[in-house]
Every structure is written in C-alpha cells, then in structure tokens.
A protein has these predicted regions:
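Positively charged n-region of N-terminal signal peptides that target proteins for export
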Residues: 1-5, 9-10
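Broad structural signal for hydrophobic residues in well-ordered alpha-helices, predominantly aliphatic
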Residues: 14-15, 234
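C-terminal segment of classical bacterial N-terminal signal peptides
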Residues: 15-24
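Surface-exposed repetitive/solenoidal architectures
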Residues: 24-254
Length: 254
C-alpha cells in the first residue's frame, strides 16, 4: 500500500512539474516552417560552441548538416539553444541523425529552454534503418533537455526498426526534462516503438521526462514481435551493460 501511494505521489509531482514548463512557453513567439533548410548559422560560424535557433529553417538545417553522407557534423562539444516555439506543420520532417549505424548522429547538447516544437509530421516509407522522430540517432554523450514535442504525428510503415517521437535511438546519451504528445504508429513488425524514445542503449540516462502520446502497434504477424512502451520501446544490452550506468528516474506517462 505504501509503495502504491508513493508511486501515485511521484506521478502527481512530475505531472505538476510539467505545468510550469508548459506555461513558460505560452505567449512566446512561434516560427512557422516554410519547408526549407538554413545552414548559414553553422557554415559561417563553424568554430562557435553555442548556437541560438529562432526559426524552423535553422532546425531543418541542423538535420541537413548531421545527415550529410559525406561530411556529417555531430556537434560534439557544442550547444544549441531553442529561443522560441517552432511549428513544423505542412511539411514532412527529416530526423536529425539517421542511418543504421553511428555514421550520422547528434552528439552535442540541444537545450529547448522549455519551448515547444509542434506538429511534427513524419510518414516514412523508405528503407533507412533509423528515421522517424525529431532526432533519429543521439550518441556519444549527446544530450536533449528542456524540450516539448507537441501534437506529433508519426506513421512508421517501413523497415526502420526503431521509432520514437523525441528520438528513435539514444546510445550513451542523456535525455532530461523532455515531454511528448501526439501519436506514433507502427504497422510493420520487429520494431522498438516508444512515446518518447524508441530504443536506449549503453549508458543512456533518462530523467524527469514524460509523455501522453498515443503509441499504436498493429502488426499481426506472429513471427514479428514489437517492443512497445509508453515512454521507451526498448532498453537493450542487458547482458553487456553494467546497470549502475543506466539511469531512468522521475519519469511518468499518462
């Protein structure tokens, strides 16, 4: 009984904790995406260690830089700040970091400063292995924090294996004070699907996060099994990882 009361109390605390985070973003300006990508904030300032985003085009530019097949930029040691809300309506989003290996991943720090990224739309039917959420691959100490991804609509009907609204795959990274809502749906088997993150591996830490996203898996083939979670689809490498390195605390789902 005591454990049950404690769990309910913790859930209430963290739900309430998100109220000021959401309220903080209310009333701020919103930039609407025109479908293009702007990389000038980086190409003209490559030695900078901090960048401030005010447009959705800059965010799309980040995806373009990280996903470049010949000259991918991981942003390790650099911090990106989101200075206002972004609306991604009307154009399909290309995740930041993609591919089936660690060749193209985000390793910097993305600080949303409690702002919202709204109406992320991604209906993918290609053959990339990781390509669904706001971030495709976060690795090597990459950090996502203080960010809300609101009213996302993700429909994964391919063989991409991993799908999450905030991030598909986090390998040895940190996700802190992040929240997602909307819908993520998978209609193909053998996937890891989560309302927040599709898959966490190695020394990943998830702290103070929540989601009330709808997570749907409709695969009916008994030979294909999905691993589905309200927050995280799968946490892998149980036999290889020292679980003292794994942190998952102060999280909730609705």
């Amino acid at each position: 009984m005591k454990k049950k009361l404690l769990s309910l109390l913790l859930a209430l605390c963290f739900v309430m904790a998100l109220v000021p985070m959401t309220a903080f973003a209310e009333g701020t300006s919103v930039d609407n995406w025109d479908g293009t990508a702007d990389t000038s904030w980086y190409t003209d300032h490559k030695t900078d260690t901090e960048y401030h985003f005010t447009t959705a085009e800059q965010l799309a530019g980040l995806a373009q830089l990280v996903n470049d097949k010949t000259a991918s930029v991981s942003f390790e040691g650099k911090t990106i700040y989101l200075d206002n809300d972004l609306d991604l309506s009307g154009t399909q989003w290309t995740p930041i970091g993609n591919g089936g290996n660690f060749g193209r991943y985000f390793a910097g720090t993305f600080n949303g400063q409690h702002h919202k990224i709204m109406n992320l739309n991604h209906h993918y039917t290609g053959d990339e292995l990781v390509r669904n959420g706001l971030f495709g691959v976060v690795s090597d100490g990459g950090t996502l924090k203080n960010l809300l991804v609101i009213d996302a609509d993700i429909d994964s009907n391919d063989g991409s294996l991993i799908a999450g609204i905030l991030a598909d795959w986090v390998n040895g990274g940190t996700v802190e004070n992040c929240y997602t809502s909307g819908k993520i749906e998978n209609n193909v088997g053998s996937k890891f699907v989560g309302g927040l993150i599709g898959q966490c591996t190695w020394s990943t830490q998830v702290k103070g996060c929540g989601s009330d996203a709808t997570v749907i898996s409709t695969e009916s083939d008994e030979d294909h099994v999905d691993t589905v979670g309200g927050l995280i689809g799968q946490w892998e490498n149980g036999q290889l990882v020292d679980y003292r390195l794994l942190v998952w605390r102060f999280c909730f789902l609705q």
